[in-house]
């Protein structure tokens, strides 16, 4: 039990910090008709030009971060949905920041999502037709809160057949000040 008491008048400010650790291993990928993988990259910006840095799992607060998802499926699959769970400590980019990325938002037309929806806990990337054997869209975030976090797996599959899905492994991400 934690008890906080106050005596006297005036402004009162309290701060509490809680850490919780599970003694469980990281989530391993689930594959079936599909396979999903995810990599994190720092995004380098020089003027109005953006480039992908090396894959890594440690970032500094304020850094622009890209996740590249890879959904492997049978060529010709239709109505695919990939969901990238927003890692704790990160924020999705604003619409203006996202627009500044221009063509860097996707790698070729085949990997351009038909729709992108940003929700509180995930970014959903949809594709209507798979012209190759994989769909590799990108999602962008900003590292905000320092800490060490376990990122939930990305998941994907057919929109209208929810039993056909796969998910990636979970990742451990570190954000420093």
Feature annotation, model-predicted:
Residues 1-177:
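Long, domain-scale non-catalytic interaction/scaffolding regions in large secretory-pathway
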């Amino acid at each position: 039990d934690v008890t906080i008491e106050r005596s006297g008048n005036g402004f009162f400010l309290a701060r509490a910090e809680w850490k919780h650790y599970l003694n469980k291993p990281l989530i391993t990928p689930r594959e079936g008709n599909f396979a999903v993988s995810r990599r994190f990259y720092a995004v380098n910006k020089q003027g109005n030009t953006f480039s992908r840095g090396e894959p890594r799992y440690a970032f500094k607060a304020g850094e622009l971060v890209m996740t590249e998802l890879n959904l492997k499926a049978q060529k010709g699959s239709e109505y695919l949905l990939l969901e990238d769970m927003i890692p704790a400590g990160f924020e999705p980019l604003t619409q203006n920041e996202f627009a500044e990325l221009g063509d860097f938002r996707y790698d070729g037309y085949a990997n351009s999502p038909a729709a992108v929806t940003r929700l509180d806990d995930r970014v959903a990337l949809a594709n209507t037709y798979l012209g190759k054997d994989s769909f590799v869209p990108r999602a962008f975030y900003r590292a905000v809160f320092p800490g060490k976090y376990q990122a939930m797996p990305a998941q994907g599959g057919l929109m209208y057949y929810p039993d056909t899905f796969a998910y990636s492994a979970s990742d451990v991400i570190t954000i420093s000040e």
